[in-house]
Amino acid sequence: MKARGSRENASKRRPSQTQYDTHLRTNQRITITRTAESHELVNQRHKIFTQSFLRTFRNQQVNKRLTKKNHLGIKKSSIVTL
């Protein structure tokens, strides 16, 4: 019977430090080769999304305030009529 931490399973558990370093290096190379131009579309999409999200969020906040005011107005008017 083999020991639990056998060498065969070691590679499955976690990459060695050298593998990890090469992985990092390739990722760095990829990020360096990406220019601002390639990110421009992503940035535009993100900007459009955030603008629309903020718009809907602001509208929700305004609606909340208005409904609160209306409720308060209804309560006040009902008290006055009594």
Swiss-Prot record:
Residues 16-25 have a biased composition (Polar residues). Residues 1-11 have a biased composition (Basic and acidic residues). Residues 1-25 are annotated as: Disordered. This is Uncharacterized protein IRL7. It comes from Human cytomegalovirus (strain AD169). The lineage of its organism: Viruses, Duplodnaviria, Heunggongvirae, Peploviricota, Herviviricetes.
